[in-house]
A protein has these predicted regions:
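Non-catalytic accessory regions of SAM-dependent methyltransferases
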Residues: 1-57, 65
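Conserved AdoMet
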Residues: 2, 44-122
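Conserved RecA-like P-loop NTPase ATPase core
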Residues: 45, 172, 202, 217, ...
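Conserved beta-strand segments of alpha/beta enzyme cores
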Residues: 99, 154, 179-181, 275-278
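Conserved SAM/SAH cofactor-binding pocket of Class I
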Residues: 111-212, 218, 260
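Mobile active-site "lid"/loop adjacent to the S-adenosyl-L-methionine
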Residues: 205-235
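Conserved Class I SAM-dependent methyltransferase catalytic core
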Residues: 230-293
Length: 295
């Protein structure tokens, strides 16, 4: 990162643009991303450090220079240059129209998971007092989105990680969602003997040793939230096989899964005795969420 310009230069035309270009170029080169994408990220870091909006950075060059000279900006830019995901650097990520607190203790919410929420919402009427279980809640993005949009539902969210549960509870408070009970435990451990109208989960589904784990954002995310045994199906087997006794009659199980796993997951649901098994595809036409119903 080049040195900030002197005070006499702060108000010169194009000063803010020069700052943006210099840091954007460095970020694009380090992360092999497009210049427009790098520019957007630099603007986000500057607005956070300077506590100003993006328009002000361009309209008032001195504000851009001031933000750029802060220790907060230098630290966050260095973290991003190392490849750390923006969600962790900024401490937040938008999901389903809501901004969630994010920490390295939780998986970063992804657009594919919004498909899971959409399918769940279709099965929950706005006035329904249905019982819902979110297994492996992580940041709580699924449970909180459902709780926000279906306030009559009664939701239980579980996770093995105390740190993840703390983030999830914080997100529920942030969005004023009060119809979620959070419990610590592995999968159904914390809800022994209970039944639910809907069970949702975005479990780990990456095979241990997958080459993608040492690339991009995955390098920084918690392995326990990503990997599930040598074939990626360890968690899926555990959830699907144990789900039927925890479903009410007519209740549904919805699970997110990886690229190319759709048919195998559908077969798991059928083998567990679930019926009306369907898949929801992403924008590329790839099955990413599979659902089944207890007869």
């Amino acid at each position: 990162m080049s040195a900030a310009p002197g005070a006499d230069h702060l108000s010169a035309p194009g000063a803010a643009e020069q700052l943006l270009r210099a840091d954007s170029s460095a970020l694009a080169s380090a992360l092999h991303i497009s210049l427009p994408e790098a520019r957007r990220e630099v603007q986000m870091l500057l607005t956070r450090a300077g506590q100003v909006d993006a328009a002000s950075l361009l309209a008032y060059p001195e504000r851009a220079a001031q933000a750029r000279s802060t220790a907060a900006y230098a630290q966050t830019l260095a973290r991003r240059l190392s490849g750390e995901p923006m969600a962790y650097v900024l401490g937040e990520r938008e999901f389903f129209g809501l901004v969630f607190e994010i920490s390295p203790a939780v998986l970063i919410p992804r657009p594919e998971t919004e498909l899971l929420v959409e399918l769940a919402l279709e099965r929950l009427t706005a006035q329904s007092a249905a019982t819902v279980l979110d297994l492996g809640t992580g940041s709580g993005c699924i449970a909180v989105a459902l709780g926000k949009l279906r306030p009559a539902a009664r939701i239980v969210a579980t996770d093995l990680s105390p740190d993840a549960l703390e983030v999830a509870r914080s997100n529920a408070r942030r969005h004023g969602v009060t119809n979620i009970a959070f419990h610590a435990g592995s999968w159904f451990e914390a809800v022994a003997g209970e039944r639910f109208d809907l069970i949702v989960s975005n479990p780990p589904y990456v095979a241990r040793g997958d080459a993608h784990l040492v690339q991009g954002d995955l390098r920084f995310e918690p392995a326990v939230a990503l990997t599930a045994g040598p074939d990626g199906f360890e968690a899926m087997h555990a959830i699907v096989s144990a789900a039927p006794p925890h479903l009410t009659r007519g209740g549904s199980l919805l699970v997110e899964h990886g690229h190319g796993q759709g048919e195998a997951v559908a077969q798991l649901l059928r083998s567990a005795g679930l019926v009306d098994v369907i898949a929801r595809n992403d924008l590329a036409g790839i099955a990413r969420v599979t659902a089944g119903r207890r007869p």
